[in-house]
Swiss-Prot record:
Its main location: cytoplasm. This is Ribosomal RNA small subunit methyltransferase H. The lineage of its organism: Bacteria, Bacillati, Cyanobacteriota, Cyanophyceae, Nostocales. It comes from Trichormus variabilis (strain ATCC 29413 / PCC 7937). Keywords: Cytoplasm, Methyltransferase, rRNA processing, S-adenosyl-L-methionine, Transferase. PANTHER family: 12S RRNA N4-METHYLCYTIDINE METHYLTRANSFERASE (PTHR11265:SF0), S-ADENOSYL-METHYLTRANSFERASE MRAW (PTHR11265).
Length: 305
């Protein structure tokens, strides 16, 4: 069992050391200005937050994350900015957005490199670990609870809906036959054994979509995103901007329609901004990133002022 100091080492060094995706596009998209107040709703290790704070003088930033490890890393990364930064531990959907308080809001969705590369968090089948997948470790529901307790139909439904897995019924049947499962590798092996060889040895591991579905369900990710999209625009000042980075089609669809359907927002990106080939070569995580940006409309009666 790792000591507290060993865990801290992994948080501070292994972590959140990955490069922020679409860095210049985010700063430009938010139109960061001197004296502005910005919200990073998914601060992670603080990579994007640092760019925002460095983009103009006297910038203030509120850094939100539901993961205690992330906040530990972000506090170290952003320590030099002192009282310019306020840290809040919260899921971005549960955060109490102050009305008309921010010049820009950023959300970088999905799982970080840290979560995938830290075995004890249980997000990846590349490492043997307990089936966990909780972003907020204060919550009770884990991936093991879903896999071992939900019935076959429920499992098939979530694999299809949230993982877009075509073999969802077949995989769910095998899981129910073989459970209980305790580790990520046990589950991944059962999934691989349930699919035809052409899928088993394909470029994408057959467990990939199932693990995505489990992560989404355990963390209620899509419902949280819907709530965030409803609440966040109210926190922007007129002319303030919201920038959201998504990593898979389910997220991007919600972001696209959420921004478009908000009566208080004007969408600035007809198509999502994606990484350049140079960035992808330098930071492979950016390959699937899509950035959408919208601007808060002026209040009624302010348009001509």
């Amino acid at each position: 069992m790792k000591s507290h100091s060993a865990k801290s080492l992994s948080v501070e060094e292994a972590t959140f050391s990955h490069l922020p995706v679409l860095p210049q596009e985010v700063v430009t998209g938010l139109a960061v200005r001197s004296g502005g107040h910005y919200l990073d709703a998914t601060v992670g290790g603080g990579g994007h937050s640092r760019l925002i704070l460095e983009a103009a003088p006297d910038v203030r930033l509120t850094a939100v994350d539901q993961d205690g490890d992330a906040l530990t890393a972000a506090k170290k990364e952003l320590a030099e900015f002192g009282e310019q930064v306020k840290f809040v531990r919260s899921n971005f959907a549960a955060y109490e957005f102050p009305v008309a308080s921010f010049d820009g809001v950023l959300a970088d969705l999905g799982v970080s490199s840290y979560h995938l590369d830290t075995p004890e968090r249980g997000f990846s089948f590349r490492h043997q670990a307990n089936l966990d997948m909780r972003m907020d470790q204060r919550q009770s529901l884990s991936a093991a609870d879903v896999i071992n307790d939900w019935d076959e139909v429920e499992l098939a439904n979530i694999f299809f809906k949230y993982g877009e897995e075509r073999l969802s019924r077949r995989i769910a049947r095998r899981i129910v036959e073989k459970r209980p499962f305790h580790t990520t590798t046990e589950l991944a092996e059962a999934i691989a054994s349930s699919v035809p060889p052409k899928y088993r040895y394909a470029r994408i591991h057959p467990a990939t979509r199932v693990f995505q579905a489990l992560r989404i369900v355990v963390n209620d990710e899509l419902k949280s995103l819907e709530t965030f999209l409803e609440k966040a625009p109210k926190a922007l000042v007129p002319g303030g901007r919201i920038a959201i980075i998504s990593f898979h089609s389910l997220e991007d669809r919600l972001v696209k329609h959420g921004l478009r359907n908000s009566p208080s927002l004007k969408v600035l990106t007809k198509k999502p901004i994606i990484a350049t080939e140079a960035e992808i070569a330098n930071n492979p995580r950016s390959r699937s990133a899509k950035l959408r940006i919208a601007e808060k409309k002026a209040e009624m009666g302010q348009e001509d002022n």
